[in-house]
C-alpha cells in the first residue's frame, strides 16, 4: 500500500520521525533548465507541500469511511503526527484500514445504511473517542449536508467545505442556477426537478433527444442514464430514480441535454477559510463505463494553455460564488471544438486525486486538514505548475468481458501490488486474504504512475499492470492493459464514448499475432519440461537417464504447434532451446521457478514478461500475457494422438436459460411461470454495488421455471429463469 510509508507506524516517536523526514525532504531539487525533479512513489513526492511540525493541528481525527481512502487519510495523519480513529462494519473488522488506525470502533452490520451511512452512530463514535475532527473521504457521508451540520453543532470540525456549500453544490438542480449566475458555461437543460416519468418524457421532448437523466444528489455514475426516445426516457427515469433512492436516500431527478461524444475534464480547486482559492489544473476522465471513470490522467492531451486558464478561472468563480473552502472538483463536458460546459461540482476529495498530487506536488489530504484547522493556503495560483505526467488505472474486482466490467466477489488468495517499481503508487485497502464483498465498491487499487511525459507514464503503467499479481477474484486488468496500448488512446483521441467505439462488440481480450501465440506456446512447453524434471527428481525409483529433449503438442484454442524442448547450459547459463514445428529455434532463459507468479525472462535475448496463473497435472497451463488470460493445453506427443477420439462435454443451451452475469441481489422479477415473452424482454433486475442491471431474454418463448425471488442474493453464473 504502499503509497509512501510502512503500515506499521503506530508509536508517536515513529510518527514524529516520519514527520521530520517529510519536513526535511520537501526541498525541491532542480535541473539546469529549472524544471523540478522528484521521484514519485514510496518515498513521497509532495515537493510543494512540506509539513510544518510547529503548526497547530488536530490531535485526533475520525475517518468516516473505509478501504483505500481510509488508508490514504491515515498515512497523511501519521506524517502530521495526528492520531486516527477508524469506524467499520462487522465485515470490515479485519480490514487493513482498521489495523492501520490508532483506534477502531465497530458501528454496525455490512449494509451501508446501517453502518457507514448511519450519522448518529458515527457521531456517537466521535464523542466516545474524543476526536476533534472527521474526515469523510469520498462517497458515503462526504457530501451529506445534515452530517456536516450535526458535527458543527457538536463542535466537531468537518474536514471539508461548509454544510451550506455542500447543499448548494450537492443539489444538481440548485447548483445549475448558481453556476449560471456565476457566469459559468452551461449545458442546455431543464433547471427544475422532474417529478415522474410522464414529466420526464415531456421535458425530454422540449430539450430534444438525446437527454441525460440523472439524480440530483448523484455521483459516481449512479442514478444516471441516457435516453434517445420516449420509451427509454420512461424506463430509464424509473431505474435511475430507484437507483438514486438506494444509493443516496434522495430520488429527485433532473434532465439535461446529452452531449454526444464529449470529453470529461474536471478541475481541482482548493480554498481556505480566509477567502483564498486556487485551481490545481485538470484531470482527463473520459475513459468511462456506465458513467464511471476507469482511467484518468493529468494533464489532458486536449487542453491548450488558454483553455486550461479559462476553465480553471470558471471553476474558481463557481467556488467563490458559494464561499467554498477545502478541496473540491468542478466537472466539465468539453466538445471537439474545446467548448466546455459545467456538469457538476463534487464537494469532496475525488477518487482520482493522486494524479493531481503527482503533477502539482500538493498533498490534498494535508491541505484539507490544514484548512479545516483554520490555516491559510501557503501557495498562490502562480506557484501551481504542470510537472510531468501522471496516469491512474482503477483496478476493480470486475469481469471486463461483461459490459466492460460487472462486479466480482471472492477472497484474494494471492496478492502483490507493483509498488516496488519506481514511479508507481498503489492506493489500496486490501491485502492477501482480503474479501471482496457484495456490499461495497469493488475497487481493489488505484494504480498510479508518473513520468516526465505521457509516453514515460504509459510505459511504467504497462510494466506495473504486467507485474500486478491478483488471484482469487476476477479483475479488470485485461481491459486496462489493452487500453493503454490501443492506438486511439495512445494518440489521445478519446471521449466518453471511447469504450463502445473501440470495442463495439464488447471487450474480447487481447487480440494476438501468430508470433505472440507461438511465444505463449513455447513458454507453456518450457513450463511442462520444468514440471517433468521436478517430478522426476521426486521419484527415487526412476531409472535411466533423463531424456535429452521433450516433445509436445501445444494448443491455444485452434492454434497448435508441435514443439521439442532441449534443456541446455553454456557458461553457467541455463537455457531452453525450443524447436517450433522444425521451422525455428527459440532460446528462452531457464531462470524462472514454477512457483513464480511473474515470469521475467528473455526470448531470443529480448525481455519478455508473463504471469503463470495456474497449471495442473494433465497439461492445462494458464498464462497471463499483456493482461489477458490464456488457457493452453500441453500434451506429450503420445497423449496427443488419442485426443481426437475422446468424447466431448455436452454444452448447456444458453438460449433457454437466463444466467446472472454477476453476483448481486434480485431487486425485481417482472414475469410469471407460463407467461409468453418476446426476445429482449426484461424479466428481472439484479443490483450489485448499488448499480441496477436490467436482464432480458435471449429469445422468445414461455417461462418454464423461475428459480429466484425478490431480495434473494445470487452468485455469478446462477441460472435465474428457464424458457420452454
Each language-model region and where it sits:
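N-terminal beta-alpha lobe that positions the nucleotide/phosphoryl donor
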Residues: 2-330, 334-353
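Short amphipathic alpha-helical segments
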Residues: 59, 222, 299, 441-447, ...
